[in-house]
From Swiss-Prot:
The gene is ftsQ. This is Cell division protein FtsQ. It is a single-pass type II membrane protein. The keyword Methyltransferase does not apply. Residues 56-126 form the POTRA domain. Residues 262-276 have a biased composition (Low complexity).
């Protein structure tokens, strides 16, 4: 058989196989394109569905944490101030957290989303241990904050006063001097520090102490030592101690005031009973 005839026969045998390979390759390409188109269209539809606020709105608000000053409406209004709430997928919880922490009595807020439509917020409020310059409060760490006056209630707190930015210093002084006074059953009602670092105290019995600058603890100890003598003199004279000025190297200047009528009558009755 000639070489030409052999080549012709081989060519005829390969043609059907080549056609099948081409068809398979084309089918594979079409299938891949179909899959890609399906994924793209599906992703587009799902993304649109997730971004549709009518399908996945953050419509539920859950608040946790110990609250004394925060009302539900405070949080709701803080969130609405940012505009209409986003969807579960699009809402940035960090923005909400920052907005809530702008409330002056909020120490910390933790915000997270709960599928499918819930916003969970955990609140930590500042805990006041004293009032600061009448208008604010101070916590145990020396942080100052404010609370709406109608939410404070009847909570009785010591009063602290000082220059702006000195809350931590005044609080530390209040604690140290309060510990000294507590040993003799005194309680600090008020502590004030001037811009020159001069201290004035008011005790729970109404006595005012002027400690001046420097040696405050030494001067406070002097008052504790003098108090029994001053108290005895007050009872003898039928007066009360109004103030004690301790800005001296030794001794003190004492201011006296009349007893309130009820205390004066009580002392007179007690004296008469002792005479009988």
């Amino acid at each position: 058989m000639s070489q030409a005839a052999l080549n012709t026969r081989n060519s005829d045998e390969e043609t059907p196989s080549s056609r099948r390979n081409n068809g398979t390759r084309l089918a594979g390409i079409l299938f891949l394109l179909t899959v890609l188109c399906t994924v793209f269209v599906s992703g587009w539809v799902v993304l649109g569905w997730m971004e549709d606020a009518q399908r996945l709105p953050l419509s539920k608000l859950v608040l946790t944490g110990e609250r004394h000053y925060t009302r539900n409406d405070d949080i709701r209004q803080a969130i609405l101030a940012l505009g209409a709430p986003g969807t579960f997928m699009t809402q940035d919880v960090n923005i909400i957290q920052s907005q809530i922490e702008r409330l002056p009595w909020i120490k910390q807020a933790s915000v997270r989303k709960q599928w499918p439509d819930e916003l969970k917020i955990h609140l930590v409020e500042y805990v006041p241990i004293a009032r600061w310059n009448d208008q604010h409060m101070v916590d145990a760490e020396g942080n100052t904050f404010s609370v709406p006056s109608d939410r404070i209630g009847k909570q009785v707190l010591p009063m602290l006063y000082g220059p702006e930015g000195s809350a931590s210093e005044v609080l530390q002084g209040y604690r140290e001097m309060g510990q000294v006074l507590a040993k003799d059953k005194f309680t600090l009602k008020e502590a004030a520090m001037t811009a020159r670092r001069s201290w004035q105290l008011t005790l729970n019995n109404g006595i005012k102490l002027n400690l001046g600058r420097g040696d405050t603890m030494k001067r406070l100890a002097r008052f504790v030592e003098l108090y029994p003598v001053l108290q005895q003199q007050a009872q003898t004279d039928g007066k009360r101690i109004s103030y004690v000025d301790l800005r001296y190297d030794s001794g003190a200047a004492v201011g006296w005031a009349p007893l309130p009528p009820e205390e004066s009558n009580q002392q007179q009755n007690q004296a008469q009973a002792e005479q009988q």
